Amino acid sequence: MPHRASLSIHPRRTLDFSRISFFFSSLRSLRLCDLCVNSFSVFFLFLALAEVSLSGCSSRNPSDPSSLTFLIESSPTNLDPRFATDSQSQRIDGLLFSGLLERDNQMNFHGDLAESWSTPDPLTYVFHLRHGVRFHDGRALTVTDVKATFEFIMNPANKSPKRGALRMVNSIETPDEATVIFHLSQPFASFSLNLIPSAIGIVPANAGADFSRHPIGSGPFRFVQQSQDEEVVVERSPEYFRDAPRIPRVRFRVVPDGVVRALELRKGSADLEMSSLSPDIIPVLARQPDLAVTDRPGTNLTYLGFNLEDPVLSHREVRQALALATDREALIRYLLHGQAKLAAGVLPPDHWAAEPNVAPYPYDPARAEQLLDAAGFPRKQDGVRLQLTLKCSTEEQARLIGAALQEQWRRVGIQLELRPLELATLFSDVAKGNFQITYQRWVGANTDPDFFEYAFSSKRFPPEGANRGHYRNSRIDALTDQIRVEMNQEKRKALCSEVQKILADDLPYLPMWFNDVVSVHRRSLGTLELPSTGNYNFLATLHASGN
């Protein structure tokens, strides 16, 4: 059902003109196009009103006060963990399924389905399963299910996008009812990362082709229903082998429009959102007595991806010029309101393998013009050097960033066309190579050095991986292969350092920033223990009192 909102202004309330003045000065400093200024100023004024009322928006069912309504921007595309690659699917899968291992907020691994595990040598991983674990349908989870899950992904006939992550697995052995042994063809330093619930959750051995329509896992929540582009409903599982979640039911309601998400929270018909609102709206909502804001530094990377098979973007000088023509600090300051940290590379700055001597590209439009001249793209009579197209999502912030890039790049002679697309279409186009530049975000995957191979190796073009820009560099291929098998962390770090220096020069991506994780939620939920990756696993221990 479409969400419609009508606005009424309380006659005794006034607007916060100081914030509005700051907002307009921010836009002027960025010199955004008039259309962007007009549309977003209306948006801001709309939410800056002291009193807002809605008509036609659904509200929480008062007969079910312990349920939680979580607003999300888009539907998960596939809840089968053998195929899920989009962030919404992986985050919800992390609640529905269990993995052999799990990872805490400090990125340390612990047993999940595995009660214990060992690596007697670099090619052998032995897992001993917990006793008494059951799927949500009551059937016992066995070593047969574990083996079948991984072998399904490894079978090329099934075309799982996760097959490449397991290509070093030679065989899987189940010598008894509680033991699973993985035999690798060569050492794989990041193998454990593929064993957490959001990466590869264990499914029943008989899971068929329609499994994504009614997934059955063994995680803290069980699937109830999904209405595409409307909602996903989960409820706590009585079969869960650990302490049951305190929240009986979570309703992930799909509300694509940021205005409506904010108004739903303002009205009280939703309980929380996470990193889905325009940063300018958050202070307005934070002033509401029943709402609170919890935030923390995040690891999710926003980036510009370049298609290196494009005849223009295949020039390294052009990619470097685009980096120099982008005033990222201004974008963070004025459009993100400081809720992000400038990125120099794809690894978070406090990561053990991050290279400190790789610095972010500075804002230097004069140098950008020199590079464009040298690459053979002089200004024409109309002042335009190039015409490029940026594909992004339809969310407000993406379109606003795109409009700012239009203006910044115009100053160096680049005419940028924006093409906002629904997420499913955007992901499909990018995977097919049907793009020049894309504005996207990496969620979670960039917290391990194995990401370099997954995103930049020439062996990892889709569907085998995420090298969507078809970047080719034989040295990167060799280094990322070594990173995957090197078990010594200091040696691995040295390999990662060289990779980061090459990527900073070649620039197949322009790392923009690491977004803070920010949640607007009902104050009665308390301070949320938000993970830096933005996952939803905190819901398993959240208390829903005061609904």
Model regions and ranges:
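Gly/Pro-rich hinge or "lid" segments in bacterial periplasmic/extracellular proteins
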Residues: N108, P187, L193-P245, R249, ...
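Surface-exposed binding/hinge segments that line
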Residues: S118, V126-H128, K162-P204
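N-terminal lobe/hinge region of extracytoplasmic solute-binding protein
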Residues: I72-D121, E151, H214-S218
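Ligand-site clamp/hinge motif
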Residues: A209, P238-P283, Q406-E407, Q415-E417
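Extracytoplasmic/peripheral linker and loop segments enriched in polar/acidic and small residues
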Residues: V126, Q415-L426, Y454-R523, N547
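Long beta-strand-rich cores associated with HINT superfamily self-processing modules
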Residues: S519-N547
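Ligand/substrate-recognition segments at binding pockets and active sites
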Residues: R60, Q228, A375-G444, Q489, ...
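Append "and occasionally in soluble cytosolic enzymes with long acidic Gly/Pro-rich linkers
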Residues: R236, S314-E407, R472, L479, ...
